[in-house]
Amino acid sequence: MLLHAAGDQHAWASFVGAGSLPTYNPFDPPARPEGTVTELVDAAVAAATAAWDQVDPASGSVPTPLPPVPTLPAEVAAAACALDAAIHAWDVAVATGQPSPLSDELAAALDPAARAVVEPLRGFAYAAPLATEATDGAAAALLRYLGRDPEWAA
């Protein structure tokens, strides 16, 4: 999962104009990173940060690494990139028995990007949505929309 998530961030960085594509397919990553996990994550965060630092949020559309959604308004694209990172952070956290890093506030901020990109990717990058529950906060509702069970634990 970490190699996939890091590869996604490198892909976003490359498409918005800074950085290079990962040397592997993020959807078929190698079993282990070339360096440490910390080096892998640090490099992905640095690449994404450097790329987005060069993008003016009011600049119009930017290219994306999402074939069904080849361009998005810059603000939506940045949020879609952040959505990818945040959801994979949730995946890793819950799979390793750690608390969710996805707050209701962050989920609410990322929800518009999810609504802009998820449906064309449904079945490939996202599972079918799960039914929401009356007690769901923004984080649980977003996870269910993305096909993830917010109650899942390792």
Regions found by a protein language model. Name each.
Residues 2-18:
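Alpha-helical bundle segments that constitute or directly flank the non-heme di-iron/ferroxidase center
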Residues 14-26, 39, 43, 47-50, ...:
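Structured surface interface patches that mediate subunit assembly and partner/cofactor docking
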Residues 29:
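Short helix/strand-bridging catalytic loops that position acidic/His residues to coordinate divalent metals
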